[in-house]
Amino acid sequence: MVRFESTDSLMLARQLPNKTVALILAGGRGSRLKDLTATRAKPAVHFGGKFRIIDFALSNCLNSGVRRIGVITQYQSHTLVQHIQRGWSFLNEEMNEFVDLLPAQQRLSTEQWYKGTADAVCQNLDIIRRYDAEYIVILAGDHIYKMDYSRMLLDHVEKGAECTVACIPVPISEGSEFGIMEVTADYQITAFYEKPANPPPIPGDPSNALASMGIYIFNADYLFKLLEEDNNTPGSSHDFGKDIIPQLTARKVVWAHPFDLSCVTSNAELPPYWRDVGTLDAYWRANLDLASVTPELDMYDRAWPIRTHMEPLPPAKFVQDRSGSHGMTMNSLVSGGCIVSGSVVVHSVLFPRVRVNSFCTIDSSLLLPDVHVGRSCRLRRCIIDRACHIPEGMVIGENANEDSARFYRSEGGVVLVTRDMLAKLEAK
């Protein structure tokens, strides 16, 4: 491997991605998304009209100059694998660029599935060592954000850290959902608590706690030693947040990296955008954020594009029905292949190939690919899963009791509709 000795920060920031491999943890069940992940891994869930959730981590890697990527898969991986093969096969292996799929294999040495995030990396150490990288970036494949990893790499190297953890302030009321850290003035991590019942606040900011974003940078050789130690530790859950990071605080080798130092935004006045879309309510909100007049996440930034598999689809079409009613949309995202006929779509996201027939009102809803809505339907605060056919005249989102009896209704009042739910309803 070519080694660069330049001490210039700008030059170093450009060189570091070439010495780096990114590992995206994409095997999670995403059980809090309920039936939305019954047939697909959470990173493969559709998002933002035309994307999959994993496209954000993959695009961040490419835009940051990290073009050697391993995607670690396990649960319901077919859809995810298919998406990566179709949409991310353009990298040039001759230039040492790749997206490598690393499925759980139940190797002879373990004969077990991945037991935790650290074990998922550990079981692939033989492959990862062959990448011959100096730095390993470990990413969650199920978050929505834009980040320049080269800036975090530079911070990691300049501080002389063995490990660096990206962090972001979160409301103290939500702190128990994250790994929470305590840091010194220069962001050395002195304590780390995985999903604590009583998260410690940020000093001087009692309303917020400092949360891990699930983004780690390790010196490669140090990571390999840590994983081997953890693999031989009785009682370990083999998880980065629960086991690896907490023990590093005592060794004083781990630093935090504030997200606002590497967040990519086209509007400096907006706060750094990072969303964990782990619940139906959070997933619904994050999608509809993009349909607002001035969304916090700029998907139109040509300097930091989010790439995905591009299907050969015709443009969206809005037509009038035979009675002369026009198809109309307001504050919505409408993807290729959609047809809206004589209906009104308000503050919603229509994914590819959605068909909305006449006399319908679609309000604050997500219609995933290939959804067909019959005539005279009213849908409000809904997530309609892929390929659902909503019968003519159906009303969803206006009666909480009816919605709960027929479909799944979240704590925030968002109604999830799947093909299985519709089939059971039809069979009654």
From Swiss-Prot:
Belongs to the bacterial/plant glucose-1-phosphate adenylyltransferase family. This is Glucose-1-phosphate adenylyltransferase. Homotetramer. Its EC number is 2.7.7.27. SUPFAM superfamilies: Nucleotide-diphospho-sugar transferases, Trimeric LpxA-like enzymes. It catalyses: alpha-D-glucose 1-phosphate + ATP + H(+) = ADP-alpha-D-glucose + diphosphate. Alpha-D-glucose 1-phosphate binds at residues 114, 179, 194-195, 212. GO terms for biological process: glycogen biosynthetic process. It comes from Yersinia pseudotuberculosis serotype IB (strain PB1/+). One of its GO terms (molecular function) is glucose-1-phosphate adenylyltransferase activity. Pathway: Glycan biosynthesis; glycogen biosynthesis. It is an enzyme of class 2 (transferase). Pfam families: Hexapep_GlmU, NTP_transferase. NCBIfam families: glgC, PRK00725.1, PRK00844.1. The gene is glgC. Keywords: ATP-binding, Carbohydrate metabolism, Glycogen biosynthesis, Glycogen metabolism, Nucleotide-binding, Nucleotidyltransferase, Transferase. The keyword Transferase applies. Gene3D superfamilies: Hexapeptide repeat proteins, Spore Coat Polysaccharide Biosynthesis Protein SpsA, Chain A. InterPro entries: ADP-Glc_PPase, ADP_Glu_pyroP_CS, GlgC_bac, GlmU/GlgC-like_hexapep, NTP_transferase_dom, Nucleotide-diphossugar_trans, Trimer_LpxA-like_sf. The keyword Membrane does not apply. Involved in the biosynthesis of ADP-glucose, a building block required for the elongation reactions to produce glycogen. Catalyzes the reaction between ATP and alpha-D-glucose 1-phosphate (G1P) to produce pyrophosphate and ADP-Glc.
